[in-house]
Swiss-Prot record:
Name of this chain's protein: Taste receptor type 2 member 42
Membrane-spanning segments: 8-28, 51-71, 102-122, 128-148, 188-208, 239-259, 266-286
Swiss-Prot/TrEMBL keywords: G-protein coupled receptor, Glycoprotein, Membrane, Receptor, Sensory transduction, Taste, Transducer, Transmembrane, Transmembrane helix
Function: Receptor that may play a role in the perception of bitterness and is gustducin-linked. May play a role in sensing the chemical composition of the gastrointestinal content. The activity of this receptor may stimulate alpha gustducin, mediate PLC-beta-2 activation and lead to the gating of TRPM5.
Positions glycosylated per UniProt: N163
Location of this chain's protein in the cell: Membrane
Extracellular side: 1-7, 72-101, 149-187, 260-265
Leftover remarks: Most taste cells may be activated by a limited number of bitter compounds; individual taste cells can discriminate among bitter stimuli.
CDD domains: 7tm_TAS2R42 (cd15024)
């Protein structure tokens, strides 16, 4: 039977699901309608749409996972149900993270200005480089899936012990295997984080250089390029902040799950963990002029609709 904590946890998870769905469905619908209308799909819109679709899939997996943890946590230890849910969550999370990273890199090459020949060469081949990053992410996904499968097999075989911590103390070999596998899974998460952090640092350097050139030419410090730099930096910084919260929450959740199974604190870690797919879409909407203007028009129409008095029945 669900406790009060379980009910609060499920209510908050459903709220995160609704918030995330609203933002990502909006992004997908706007970009698809624009692509159909213009008969052309731009690279940024394509990445945004793929990111929205991937996040929608992740949100559904998260919702199912939350109901499983909140209402039937004992089923999580079953090999037939626990393994597919964990694998699906990691796959959708991997795709979402890498697509968000590709979007950060795309904005960097689209907005930043450097006279260096290497930067110009990479910028000229930006679309091909994004494709190569996506191919790299697929290879890493295969590697992660193989490592994760071994990790789950070992964990689910021992998680039904009455005292997992004591069992791991007695079996140092198993503990060492779990530690190595967990380290490998964590290291692969640092690759998209480091790429996004590098993009942010170079965006900042480009903004400083651009602002200094404007001051030297007596044109002030605000123009369209400066604003584009700042918007892109805010988007990448917000992504990095959410990613840091997401990454550390994942480590805490894994530790609680495998060392203190069925502990109530895993629910708080899951709430923080799932903030990334729920909130990131609204950061993307605010940072994209087309999406932001469409959202403002939609809210304006909804406001006018709610204020329109209903006609009296005859």
């Amino acid at each position: 039977m669900a406790t009060e904590l379980d009910k609060i946890f499920l209510i908050l998870e459903i709220a995160e699901f609704i918030i995330g769905m609203l933002g990502n469905v909006f992004i997908g619908l706007v970009n698809c309608s624009e692509g159909i209308k213009n008969q052309k799909v731009f690279s940024a819109d394509f990445i945004l749409t793929c990111l929205a679709i991937s996040t929608i899939g992740q949100l559904f997996v998260i919702l199912f996972d939350s109901f499983l943890v909140g209402l039937a946590s004992h089923l999580y230890t079953t090999y037939r149900l626990g393994k597919p849910v964990i694998m699906l969550w990691h796959m959708t999370n991997h795709l979402t993270t890498w697509l968000a990273t590709c979007l950060s890199i795309f904005y960097f090459f689209k907005i930043a200005h450097f006279p260096h020949s290497l930067f110009l060469w990479l910028r000229w081949r930006m679309n091909g480089m994004i494709v190569m990053l996506l191919i790299l992410s697929l290879f890493l996904l295969i590697f992660n899936s193989l490592v994760l499968e071994i990790f789950i097999d070992i964990s689910l075989n021992i998680i039904d012990k009455s005292n997992l911590t004591l069992y791991l103390d007695e079996s140092k070999t198993v503990y060492d295997k779990l530690s190595i596998l967990k380290t490998l899974l964590s290291l692969t998460s640092f690759i998209p984080f480091s790429l996004s952090l590098t993009s942010l640092l170079f965006l900042f350097l480009s903004l400083v250089r651009h602002t200094r050139n404007l001051k030297l030419s007596s044109l002030g410090s605000r123009d369209s390029s400066t604003e584009a730099h700042r918007r892109a930096m805010k988007m990448v910084m917000s992504f990095l902040f959410l990613f840091i919260v997401h990454f550390f929450s994942l480590q805490v959740a894994n530790w609680i799950f495998f060392m203190l199974w069925n502990n109530k604190y895993i629910k708080f870690a899951m709430l923080a963990l799932n903030a990334f797919p729920s909130c990131h879409s609204f950061i993307l909407i605010l940072g994209n002029s087309k999406l932001r203007q469409t959202a403002v028009r939609l809210l304006w129409h909804l406001r006018n609709y709610t204020k329109t008095p209903n006609p009296l029945p005859l």
